[in-house]
């Protein structure tokens, strides 16, 4: 352990400077390799001391491509198939920056930006967190069939021409649409026509907030504006001030239908009301419990009557 600490201390200045630079750059995700599934990758040997650089980047709270400690989201499973030789994969995940050890080779579109000791920082031109796409296929099914479908789509030519099938998961597949089974997606995608088609328009600008993304878009033909963030029903969209439905697009990103014209689109993550109530209750409860232990039985009775009683009633009304 002492040897690990000495090595980490020796490389800490370079990493600190790298992290500071990444925070100063325009918003975008960082690619520093992937955690692999049974095959060798340069990330496996990219360490400072006894800690992987990939893990250090994640613990800094930076927006990363790829998983490390968990794969709860649908997107995180698929990212292990990221192909660093294909520009469309960088664009798909908005992998705008690359961190890699010196000597690691990349395609020409991965441009050197700055070196920090033995760490190289690169930049890739992408469309940002938004893109205008099409969706000519619709699949419905469950999570067990999602990974084979999404990984076959990612390996195909469809991401390169911005063809993103719509996915209806679980109960959502019981809508008026007639989706193909998600279990059939591998075969269907392998036979799908890959064609670019005319321009769909331009994402003129984007703003990134803590729980929101906003874009000004000029659309030339009916399209879906895709936000490169994992789909969840708590994401709410407004187009020109009007609340609009969202859909899930491969590889589990958020899509909003747009007609031709200029539009201002806002997507916000809004936690459910009950979850917020429980979160606030949890924050309030811990210090109040500590006080109740200090003040004794009288405070406990007051706390139960004046605090827990009204909150319990609020939760019951919410369920009712």
Predicted segments, located by residue:
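Residue-level "edge-of-site" marker
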Residues: 35, 70, 103
């Amino acid at each position: 352990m002492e040897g690990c600490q000495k090595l980490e201390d020796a490389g800490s200045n370079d990493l600190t400077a790298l992290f500071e630079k990444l925070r100063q750059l325009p918003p975008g995700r960082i690619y520093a390799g992937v955690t692999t599934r049974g095959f060798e990758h340069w990330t496996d040997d990219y360490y400072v001391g006894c800690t992987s650089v990939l893990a250090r980047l994640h613990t800094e709270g930076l927006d990363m491509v790829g998983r490390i400690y968990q794969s709860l989201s649908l997107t995180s499973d698929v990212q292990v198939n990221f192909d660093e030789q294909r520009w469309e994969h960088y664009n798909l995940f908005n992998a705008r920056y690359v961190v890699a050890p010196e000597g690691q080779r990349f395609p020409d579109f991965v441009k050197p930006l700055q070196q920090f000791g033995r760490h190289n920082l690169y930049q890739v031109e992408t469309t940002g967190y938004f893109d205008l796409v099409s969706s000519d296929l619709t699949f419905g099914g469950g999570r067990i069939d999602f990974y084979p479908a999404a990984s076959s789509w990612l390996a195909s030519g469809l991401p390169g021409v911005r063809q993103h099938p719509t996915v209806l998961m679980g109960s959502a597949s019981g809508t008026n649409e007639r989706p193909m089974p998600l279990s059939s997606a591998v075969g269907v995608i392998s036979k799908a026509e890959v064609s670019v088609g005319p321009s769909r328009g331009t994402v003129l600008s984007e703003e990134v907030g803590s729980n929101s993304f906003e874009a000004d878009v000029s659309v030339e033909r009916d399209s879906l504006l895709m936000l490169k963030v994992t789909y969840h029903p708590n994401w709410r969209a407004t187009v020109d001030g009007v609340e609009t439905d969202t859909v899930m697009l491969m590889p589990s990103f958020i899509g909003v239908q747009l007609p031709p014209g200029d539009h201002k689109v806002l997507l916000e993550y809004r936690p459910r009301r009950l979850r917020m109530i429980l979160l606030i209750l949890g924050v309030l409860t811990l210090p109040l419990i500590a006080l109740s232990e200090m003040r004794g039985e009288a405070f406990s009775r007051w706390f139960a009557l004046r605090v827990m009683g009204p909150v319990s009633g609020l939760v019951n009304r919410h369920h009712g």
